Amino acid sequence: MRASPPAHSLLWLLVLLFAAPWASAQPAEPNAPPPPRNLIVLIPDGFGPTSQTMAREYLHEIEGRELVLDRILSGAVRTYASDSRVTDSAASATAYASGVKTYNGAIGLDATRAPVATILEAAEARGMATGLVATSRITHATPAAFAAHVPQRGMELDIAAQMLDQGIEVILGGGRPFFLPTDTNTDYAGRRDDGRDLVEEARERGYAVALDRAGFNAFSAIPLGGADTAPPVLGLFSDSHLAYEIDRDPSKEPSLAEMASFALAHLSTDPNGFFLMIEGSRIDHAGHGNDPVGHLHDIIAFDEAVAGALAFAEQDGETLIVVMADHETGGLSLGRNLDGRGIYDWRPDVLAQATRSVEGMLALVDEGMAPDTLMATRGGIVDLTDDERSALRDAVGVIRGPGSLYSVMAAILSERALIGWTTGGHTAVAVNLHSYGPHAERFAGVMQNDAIGRTLADVMGFDLDALTAELRAELRQEPETVVE
């Protein structure tokens, strides 16, 4: 059963206006294969080519298995934004979702701040089921770019409202407070000061809602049988981002692979096909923090979600999978020679000893554990040098910067593993492209990120230009919704 947004919803009007039969899509080239029935886009945020090498070699050497992503590696993506050679997630995800380059920070707008339709909106207009799954707040930049239109990515309260109005069938991630009012009577804090309770509004529209792990487990009882019988679902499992995979408490939060598997089972019952975006969000966050442990294990968790999607597509035969990061984060290198020691190597075995991310270890420091003890028991570094112990002691109480406890812990782990980082931000490095299924050959070689978006629309037969024109016309007719 599809959600029923209010009549005043601009984006719901788009669905009504542009709902059309399959035959109304853009005409195919003579003898071209039919469009895929289903489309799965997977985005490992902040995942560069070196990240893929790190995970590949770690899995091969430490766990004796291969990286699933390597099976479908097909090319590379240039990621620059309209206003910078180094993109952010908002601009790059907008390029993937809408086929246009835009400025850093933009969500669903072009470089002139005019709204542009997305492939999710096109899928909804066709009557397909749609889903968004992320380990970040679901209102964060990447998922937002597929379902909202705002001038700055930080407008997460607006993004949450627009996302709900889209009628998306599966929404799973973190970010509860952006859906709840500040005066909420629930056990969870809210950040909405407009009085709206989007969780309650979702229930009124027919959504099954989960705000914790128990609620997610209850989703398994939902009857599956197509859009007319299966209710849409909204799952918000954290106040902010979900935990890094290596820190995750399975009794409190589902994994990315679990959420992706549920989304596939739920959406695949729709007779009109589905669109699903899955983001491994926290790969990027660990890159920003130069945390090799968090980075590595979230890549592996993402690869498990890819494995599930690939198994589905292999059996289904009508599903296109496209995988690419929005950008690289951290300037990661495998091999480190900043101290003149001349060691040409890197050590995945060091990372294998760690059982917590740096963020996870800091949480235990807040509970009273000593940093040097944590580095031994959770970081796996049992032979700290005097210099390392001194750096840890000096960093206690330092919140930010190179001398913070986070930075010192991350640096010790990286140095021991002979891993280097060049930045705490993003880089301009081209990211790897992966594809499988019908029309996968069109996602190969070196492509621009906006070309990815246009090609996705083309192979699916979506007319984004027509939807964009209608979106802008509707905005002109409803001044209160104009993007400023």
Residue locations for each model-derived region?
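Glycine-rich anion/phosphate-binding loops
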Residues: 108-117, 150-154
